[in-house]
């Protein structure tokens, strides 16, 4: 009876073992974004934690205004205008804007400061402010849009083309999640940009065309519940919303939790009515929150490699003191890893510049690259450098140089020609010598047989 109990307990333990291992292995959860395209990036290092169709062209809607604002802040840095400059709206700046588009209800002849216009642009996405500031900076909206495209190219945006400064739909107005990240990253370098983008509200004082102040409330539900409840994300900081029927619902946001800072891009999300038939869910916000939680909860920063650690021995030629040099990482490497991946689980892939290096080698010489990956996902890349000096042997170097000299095609051809000439010369000399000896023998024989004329008596 006792034995049966022991056997039963043992079998039960064996059955439970897979459950324990499953708990450990499944600590990391995969993520699937419910939108056309998206991106989650660690802001400080640029590490990509998640991407979906990141290089696929999409319509950006009012996310365009991040580039518009960037050019304004760069013009301020260049001294071409200031936040306190007064700008008057023109008829041309207001022409062609959609009547149902986002607006701060600015009218022709109305004067505001650059700072007030930027708040209208980034907090309530007012379309007219983009044209007003574009005209003020570049002389015309068309010239400003041309500058937007030039700046996109300068930032490395390979799949972006702007047709206007507002983001209103145009089939030739497109970008990608990755390109928008590049633009946003640059704009975030301006503290005032982030200050405005993270503002829940703003009051525009009375102007020359209004008697009362205007209250602006952010269109970003992650930082303000004034327009809709249930979306506020406590770690969110900005940045910009956008939507058109063609673009869907779009959002670029950042979030800070502790010492960690992330940037997200969501393009082409939907607005849906839930099963209760009443609640409307705007997925650009809910998916952004879900993606932030996934990134913060399932990635851990770990030290994976020290620059002092040897990585590989690289063969060295032309040295009499050693036949290898030690390669090491150019820098200490730490990276965000899924919470079920330990540093020792990373696969190391070494790509050498040359399979064998010739001495002399100096410490710090580039030998190749090291890639750290797991399940086909690359988590870090770095250069491999020589750890120490390796001197060259003059004898081995000279022998190599001589060998290389005679290995050259032209030298080979000349060598064959010279050899043939030598052979021809030897043959000629030999034949000439033989002929000479043969002729000498004939003359000698003829001379020895001559008796002269017989005398007659």
List where the protein language model places each region.
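A broadly tuned, weak detector of single residues within folded domains
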Residues: 8, 39, 61, 114, ...
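Structural signal for terminal/edge beta-strands and the immediately following C-terminal loop/tail
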Residues: 410, 422, 451-455
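Sec-dependent N-terminal signal peptides of Gram-positive bacterial secreted proteins and lipoproteins
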Residues: 4-26, 416-430
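Active-site-adjacent loops and short helices of periplasmic peptidoglycan-processing enzymes
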Residues: 21-178, 182-191, 196
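Membrane-entry signal-anchor segments at the cytosolic-membrane interface
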Residues: 2-6, 409-411
């Amino acid at each position: 009876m006792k034995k049966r109990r022991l056997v039963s307990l043992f079998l039960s333990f064996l059955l439970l073992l897979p459950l324990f291992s499953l708990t450990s292995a499944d600590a990391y959860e995969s993520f699937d974004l419910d939108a056309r395209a998206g991106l989650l990036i660690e802001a400080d290092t640029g590490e990509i934690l998640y991407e979906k169709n990141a290089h696929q062209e999409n319509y950006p809607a009012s996310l365009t205004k991040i580039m518009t604002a960037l050019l304004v802040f760069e013009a301020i840095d260049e001294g071409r205008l200031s936040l306190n400059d007064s700008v008057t709206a023109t008829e041309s700046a207001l022409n062609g804007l959609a009547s149902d588009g986002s607006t701060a209800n600015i009218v022709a002849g109305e004067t505001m400061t650059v700072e007030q216009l930027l708040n209208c642009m980034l907090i309530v996405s007012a379309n007219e402010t983009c044209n007003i500031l574009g005209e003020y900076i570049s002389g015309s909206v068309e010239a400003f849009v041309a500058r937007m495209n030039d700046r996109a190219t300068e930032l490395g945006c390979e799949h972006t083309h702007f047709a206007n400064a507002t983001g209103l739909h145009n089939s030739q107005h497109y970008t990608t999640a990755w390109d928008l990240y590049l633009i946003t990253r640059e704009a975030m370098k301006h503290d005032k940009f982030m200050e405005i983008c993270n503002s829940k509200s703003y009051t525009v004082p009375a102007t020359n065309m209004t008697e009362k102040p205007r209250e602006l409330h952010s269109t970003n539900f992650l930082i303000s519940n004034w327009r809709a409840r249930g979306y506020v994300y406590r770690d969110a900081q900005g940045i910009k919303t956008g939507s058109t029927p063609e673009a869907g619902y779009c959002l670029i946001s950042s979030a800070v939790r502790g010492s960690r800072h992330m940037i997200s891009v969501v393009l082409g999300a939907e607005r849906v009515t839930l099963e209760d038939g009443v609640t409307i869910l705007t997925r650009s916000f809910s998916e952004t929150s879900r993606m932030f939680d996934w990134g913060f909860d399932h990635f851990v920063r770990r030290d994976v490699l020290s620059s002092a650690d040897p990585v590989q021995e690289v063969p060295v030629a032309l040295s009499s003191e050693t036949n290898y040099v030690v390669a090491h990482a150019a820098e200490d490497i730490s990276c965000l890893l899924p919470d079920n991946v330990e540093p020792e689980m990373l696969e190391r892939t070494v790509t050498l510049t040359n399979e064998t290096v010739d001495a002399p080698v100096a410490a710090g010489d580039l030998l190749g690259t090291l890639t750290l990956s797991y399940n086909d996902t690359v988590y870090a890349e770095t250069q491999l450098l020589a750890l120490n000096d390796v001197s060259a042997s003059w004898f081995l170097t000279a022998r190599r140089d001589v060998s290389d000299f005679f290995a050259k095609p032209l030298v080979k051809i000349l060598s064959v020609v010279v050899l043939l000439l030598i052979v021809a010369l030897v043959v000629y000399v030999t034949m000439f010598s033989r002929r000479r000896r043969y002729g000498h023998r004939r003359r000698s024989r003829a001379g020895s047989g001559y008796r002269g004329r017989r005398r007659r008596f």
